[in-house]
Swiss-Prot record:
Family (UniProt): Belongs to the ectoine synthase family.
Known catalytic reactions: (2S)-4-acetamido-2-aminobutanoate = L-ectoine + H2O
Name the UniProt record assigns to this protein: L-ectoine synthase
GO molecular function, one term: ectoine synthase activity
The protein's enzyme class: lyase
Keywords: Lyase
Function: Catalyzes the circularization of gamma-N-acetyl-alpha,gamma-diaminobutyric acid (ADABA) to ectoine (1,4,5,6-tetrahydro-2-methyl-4-pyrimidine carboxylic acid), which is an excellent osmoprotectant.
Length: 132
C-alpha cells in the first residue's frame, strides 16, 4: 500500500513549477500503478497551450475558476468546483486561469515520471525508453 500526503511533495523534485502552474506529483510511474496522480494549481490570469499527444488526462476541478478552450473547434468550457473533463482524444487546448487559483486533481495515462513540462508544442514527451 502507498500512503502519501501531498504536503510532503512540496519543495521536492516531485513539485514542478512553471510560469502558469505548479504541479505536485503524488503518484508517478515508479509507483507502478499504471497512471500518475497530481494536484495542480493553475495561476490566475494565465493561459497555457497544451497538447498531450502521448498521454490521456482526466481532470477534476476542486476549487477556484478558469476555462478550457479546444483549439480544433474553439469551444470554451468554464471550469470550477465539481467540473470534470477528460482529454480522451489528445485534444489540443488552451487552459486558462481565472480570477482565483484553479486547483485540480489530474490523472495521466501513461504515468508521468515526475519532471515533465510542456514543450514548445504543449506536449509532454515520453521517456526515452518508451520512444525507442
Amino acid at each position: 500500500m502507498i500512503v502519501r500526503n501531498v504536503k510532503d511533495v512540496i519543495g521536492t523534485p516531485d513539485e514542478v513549477r512553471t510560469d502558469t502552474w505548479v504541479s505536485r506529483r503524488v503518484l508517478l510511474k515508479k509507483d507502478k500503478m499504471g497512471f500518475s496522480f497530481h494536484e495542480t494549481t493553475i495561476f490566475p490570469g494565465t493561459r497555457t497551450h497544451i497538447h498531450y499527444k502521448n498521454h490521456l488526462e482526466a481532470v477534476w476541478c476542486i476549487e477556484g475558476d478558469g476555462s478550457i478552450e479546444t483549439i480544433a473547434d474553439g469551444k470554451r468550457y468554464d471550469l470550477g468546483p465539481g467540473v470534470v473533463y477528460a482529454l480522451n482524444e489528445h485534444d489540443e487546448h488552451w487552459l486558462c486561469g481565472g480570477k482565483e487559483p484553479l486547483r485540480v486533481i489530474c490523472v495521466f495515462n501513461p504515468p508521468l515520471t515526475g519532471q515533465e513540462v510542456h514543450d514548445a508544442d504543449g506536449v509532454y514527451a515520453l521517456p526515452q525508453a518508451e520512444t525507442a
